[in-house]
Swiss-Prot record:
Gene it is expressed from: aurR2
PANTHER family with a match to the protein in the record: UNCHARACTERIZED TRANSCRIPTIONAL REGULATORY PROTEIN, ZN(II)2CYS6 TRANSCRIPTION FACTOR (EUROFUNG)
Keyword Membrane attached: no
Name assigned to this protein: Aurofusarin cluster transcription factor aurR2
Superkingdom of this protein's organism: Eukaryota
Basic and acidic residues composition bias: residue spans: 92-113
Length: 670
């Protein structure tokens, strides 16, 4: 056996894959023990990177792309990017070295009304910068919050470099009052989003305080720190990172229209710094440039999701998002601030996997907006092209990211669920009646077959995400993406088909959804949840009635049905006990409350147990002809559902915190 050779390179590929410490020898101890080939990634030569940059600059010059028309104005650590502005560009050389952005460490500039921007802030109202010192947690709690962030949040965002920020946090333990303003804003934003990722029970167990109190404290501290850093005029990357994390926290309780405006603000802040242009990053160290790419693409994802929730259209023009390259597939351990070059993308999955897949799917959706034009909406050819593009996307994601990943790692598992669910939802989007209500009755047997198969698949992935113990740390994120449109479609298709294997399987899936989302039953004040319960009870009632009419065995009542009936009966009794002087000008009680009062007498409560999730082989359980009557069995007002979905999207946990989570005007009062 040859003598082990000590190396100074990165961890070997097998150790990176298993996320364990490599002892730095060739072969290393792990590879010797497991018999694996001990290989290390090669660092790309600098000339390759320069060649790519030169090629992009040449391409931009030949095509007239605005990516090469901008200019970076630098003053110390401050960087401002200007483009398509003849005045600023003509004076660019004269401005080099001039303070074009305020220094967060000195008194802020005065506005024309002689009011300090840090004292009267357009976004956060009046703040008191001197009060932030009392918001710092103890050293023990501070490090616990950091560990929660690294475990629950960082793998899903990747907008900062973990090892670097950890040093900053450790330095605050000894002298927190001397922490630079931008760093302080970033640290408190980390604390805030870490608390958002925890349950109330976890907060009480770890920190001895209710979750709502911790949220209020760190939200206020983050806003104060951002105001102190004069974030509206800052070009410091740490300030933008802090604001982006703050937006991630706000999306759990914030009014969607306001959140969309705030993500637009983050987009403008990034554009001012040139994050959307690859040419603005060429003179930065490779580490800094890569970090800016990560921040920019997370902002693009945030803004795109906010646009969906508000019903705003997404401009298919890619120039809106610039030409910044996607971040490369590297773990934090492979990014070294002092490195003169960036290593080649890892040939294996890294902790960037989730973000990489989200970015690739997001970019694909933006590009395909052009394909989903009038042609695809009105012609068979357009739909065929779109389905072919979806198949190609699915094949690309599977082969590049999912085929060889370690399925034992929770992040990889979540990524697989996300990617496969997204592909199914893309297929559903072509024929989903909620997008074309006037054509809901014109669907063919094959189209209904496809709708049911893919809707079941999407809902199953949500159930798997909630029922897998290893993914509990990511539920704060998963809860924001429940596929309401798909769930409504699944329930509505069952109303016209009361019996059969496919229906039995679908109802078991529906029951598990209610099991993992108890707020769908308990939160009777939410109009969307109330409507979901009504359409579920209506579909179940049709199933029971049909069984009796045909003289077959009445299906066993599911727990979700018993719970929905009980919730409505309880609300009906409470309403009947209200004084007759009740103000009738308020929100009306949903009309279908009568369904609970008129429910069949054999609703005895859910005494049975929920079956395990059906196997994937159950997806093709019925032919399109058998399913053809499903869409005609219930009269669904898809415009009504679209209005409900546009006005909803909060997680029940976040809704419970609204009474005490102080975000001034950000709270959705609905």
């Amino acid at each position: 056996m040859t003598e082990a050779k000590l190396t100074r390179g990165h961890s070997c590929v097998p150790c990176q894959h298993r996320k364990i410490r490599c002892n730095g020898q060739t072969p290393c101890a792990y590879c010797i023990r497991t018999g694996k080939e001990c290989v290390r990634m090669r660092v790309s030569p600098s000339h390759s990177r320069n060649a790519r940059l030169n090629h992009r600059r040449l391409t931009a010059a030949q095509t007239g792309s605005p990516s090469g028309d901008g200019q970076v104005i630098v003053s110390g650590d401050q960087r401002r990017y200007v483009e398509d502005n003849k005045l600023w560009k003509s004076l660019g050389d004269e401005m080099q070295g001039k303070d074009v952005s305020p220094d967060p460490e000195r008194p802020p500039l005065r506005t024309r009304t002689d009011t300090p921007s840090t004292e009267v802030n357009l976004i956060f109202s009046h703040q008191r910068p001197t009060s932030i010192s009392v918001k710092y947690p103890s050293a023990v709690h501070s490090f616990q919050l950091w560990q929660v962030f690294i475990s629950n949040v960082h793998p899903l965002t990747k907008i900062l470099h973990g090892p670097t920020v950890q040093k900053d946090i450790l330095e605050t333990f000894s002298e927190p009052t001397s922490t630079p303003g931008p760093t302080e804003a970033l640290i408190f934003a980390i604390y805030l989003v870490a608390v958002v990722s925890l349950t109330d029970a976890e907060c009480r167990s770890r920190f001895g305080e209710p979750r709502k109190d911790l949220l209020a404290r760190y939200c206020n501290a983050t806003e104060v720190a951002l105001s102190k850093a004069d974030f509206l005029r800052s070009t410091d990357l740490r300030v933008l990172q802090a604001f982006t994390l703050h937006l991630l926290s706000l999306r759990h309780i914030c009014d969607h229209d306001i959140l969309w405006l705030l993500t637009g603000l983050a987009t403008r802040m990034g554009q001012r710094m040139g994050l959307h242009r690859e040419s603005s990053l060429k003179d930065l160290p490779p580490f800094e440039a890569e970090l800016r790419r990560r921040v920019w693409w997370q902002i693009v994802i945030l803004d795109g999701r906010a646009s969906q929730l508000t019903g705003a259209s997404m401009n298919p023009n890619m120039q809106l998002y610039g030409d910044t390259q996607q971040p490369i597939n590297l773990s934090d351990a492979d990014l070294v601030p002092s490195a003169s070059t960036i290593p080649q993308p890892s040939p294996i999955t890294t902790d960037m996997l989730f973000c990489k897949v989200r970015i690739e799917i997001g970019v694909w959706m933006i590009e395909q907006k052009c394909l989903l034009g009038s042609e695809s909406e009105s012609s068979t050819t357009g739909k065929a092209k779109f389905f072919k593009a979806i198949d190609e996307l699915e094949r690309h994601i599977e082969e590049k990211y999912l085929a060889n990943m370690d399925k034992e790692l929770p992040l990889n598992l979540l990524t697989a669920y996300l990617a496969r669910s997204a592909v199914c939802q893309l297929r559903l989007s072509v024929y989903h009646p909620i997008h074309r209500p006037e054509r809901a009755s014109d669907l063919s047997a094959e189209q209904i077959d496809m709708l049911l198969e893919n809707s079941l698949e999407v809902i199953r992935y949500d159930i798997l995400s909630h029922s897998t113990p290893a993914l509990q740390c990511y539920l704060w994120h998963i809860a924001n993406f429940f596929p309401f449109e798909t769930f409504v479609l699944l329930i509505s298709t069952l109303s016209g088909r009361p019996a059969g294997q496919v229906v039995d399987t679908a109802w078991e899936v529906i029951d598990q959804v209610y099991e993992h989302h108890p707020s769908f039953v308990s939160d009777t004040s939410d109009p969307l949840y109330w409507a979901l319960g009504n359409i579920t009870l209506k579909a179940w009632d049709q199933r029971v009635t049909s069984a009796r009419t045909r003289g077959i065995t009445v299906p066993r009542e599911l727990p979700c049905i018993a719970n929905l009936v009980h919730a409505r009966a309880t609300m009906a009794r409470a309403s009947s006990q209200q004084p007759s002087t009740t103000d009738v000008s308020g929100p009306a009680t949903p009309q279908s409350l009568l369904l609970a009062q008129e429910a069949p007498v054999d609703y005895l409560g859910g005494l049975g147990t929920t079956n395990e999730l059906a196997s994937q082989t159950d997806l093709g359980m019925a032919t399109g002809e058998e399913l053809l009557g499903m869409m005609k069995g219930v009269d669904v007002d898809w415009d009504f559902w679209q209005q409900l979905l546009d006005g909803n999207g909060h997680d029940a946990r976040a809704r419970d915190d609204q009474e005490t989570f102080y975000f001034s005007s950000f709270i959705n009062k609905a």
